[in-house]
Regions:
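Short structured motifs
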Residues: 126-130, 188-189
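Short coil-to-beta transition motif at edge beta-strands of beta-rich domains
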Residues: 36-52, 162-168
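Small/polar beta-strand repeat architecture
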Residues: 2-5, 16-28, 36-39, 52-126
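Short acidic, glycine-rich loop/turn motifs
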Residues: 13-15, 49-53, 171-176
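Oligomerization/assembly interface segments of phage tail-like spikes and tubes
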Residues: 130-149, 197-212
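Short beta-strand and beta-hairpin "edge-sheet" elements
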Residues: 170-215
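Acidic, glycine-rich flexible loop segments
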Residues: 145-178, 186
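Well-ordered beta-strand positions in beta-sheet-rich domains
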Residues: 46, 57-61, 71, 178-184, ...
């Protein structure tokens, strides 16, 4: 049993990336291994994947490699199921994060989506309703910050909004754990005008990959 508060969590946006590398394969294993010629990744590097599988836009950490230099391990990623990860699923790209900008003065964080949806039906002969799960709603997060256009994150978030591409968002928890998300950024940088309150500005992100990645 445990109890944890998010107080002290720091969110950061990845603002620069190394050149994209081609991934030619990902193994079916309890710890997946990716093949990429001269990738140059080291243990601890944060990488976002791009392919046509369940790992598309998934953020991963590179594990210690006891393998040839053209291979790198995907820490905590289990691809042993050939049903979920059929042959050829891993062909795609990988991009390493090279810097993050911390988002300060956050006063509120809200999450939405992820609700399980169902298909329901009734057979004429017995009149009983049945249901089975279908999909989960797309997920999003909203961060409210005290407005300050002189802080680095302000212009970085505007640039990410204008780019319209996928970014890595990091949540560094007070326990030392880290959660990574791949997101589309929505931010116009405009302040609120509520009397007798700090001016606020709102960051909205939609998750490109519905599954976050957590590392202790």
């Amino acid at each position: 049993m445990s109890s944890s508060f998010p107080n002290g969590t720091v969110f950061s946006l990845a603002t620069s990336y190394a050149a994209t590398k081609t991934v030619t394969a990902i193994s079916n294993a309890t710890t997946a291994v990716a093949s990429s010629v001269s990738h140059g990744y080291s243990a601890g590097d944060i990488v976002i994947l791009g392919n046509s599988s369940r790992l598309d836009q998934r953020v991963i950490r590179v594990a210690a490699n006891a393998a040839p230099t053209d291979l790198f391990n995907l820490e905590g990623i289990d691809t042993s199921s050939t049903t979920l990860y059929p042959s050829g699923f891993g062909v795609g790209t990988a991009s390493k994060v090279t810097s993050f900008t911390a988002i300060s003065q956050v006063t509120d964080v809200q999450s939405a989506g992820g609700e399980q949806q169902f298909y329901q039906w009734v057979y004429l002969e017995d009149g009983r309703q049945r249901q089975r799960p279908t999909f989960k709603n797309a997920r999003s997060m909203t961060l409210v910050m005290d407005y300050d256009p002189d802080l680095a994150w302000h212009d970085d978030l505007i640039a990410a909004d204008l780019a319209g591409t996928v970014y890595v968002l990091k949540a560094s928890l007070p326990s030392g754990a880290v959660i990574y998300y791949s997101v589309y950024v929505g931010f116009d940088g405009e302040p609120s005008f509520t009397i007798n309150e700090n001016q606020k500005t709102v960051l909205s992100v939609s998750l490109a990959c519905p599954t976050s990645t957590r590392y202790a």
